[in-house]
Amino acid sequence: MKILTHNMMACTKKQCMGKGFPLKVESTEQIVLEQEFNYEFTKNIYPKLDWLGIAEISIKFNIPIQLDTTKHSLEDEEFLKTLHNLLCNLKVITGSLTCPNCQRVYPIDKGIPNMLLREDEIYQEIKE
C-alpha cells in the first residue's frame, strides 16, 4: 500500500463516517520503490492531501518533510520531490491500519489493505 493510497482511506464502519480518518499505520515490512519524480502529478495531488496524516506518516517513517502548506511550496522542487518520495515510493508490504475512532484494525498483507468488515460487524451495523 502506497502512502498516497493511505491518505485517501477511512474506516468503513458506519459509526465512523467523518471520524475514521486518518488511519494510523503500523508497518512490519515496507519497501522504497524507485519511481521517477513526476512534478505535475505531485503538484496536482498537493491540494487533496490531508496534512495531519502526512505529518504522522513522515515522522513514523523518518522522512523529514517541511509541513509548510503555503502556496510557495508548489514552487519548491526539493519539497515536491520529498513529498513524491513519501507518497509514491514508500510502500507498506505488511502491517495494519487502525481507525482513530473505533480502534478497528485493518490488516495489510502483500501491500493490500483489507478494508472489508467481518460478517458479525456487518450484522451489528444493520441492527443499529
UniProtKB/Swiss-Prot annotation:
Which keywords does the record carry?
Answer: Cytoplasm, Nucleus
Q: Name one GO molecular function term.
A: protein heterodimerization activity
Where do the TRM112 domain residues begin and end? Answer: 2-111
Q: Name one GO cellular component term.
A: nucleus
Give the matching Pfam families: Trm112p
Q: What GO biological process, any one, is recorded here?
A: maturation of LSU-rRNA
Question: Know the name of this protein?
Answer: Multifunctional methyltransferase subunit TRM112-like protein
Which organism's genome codes for this protein? Dictyostelium discoideum (Social amoeba)
What is the organism lineage in this UniProt record? Eukaryota, Amoebozoa, Evosea, Eumycetozoa, Dictyostelia
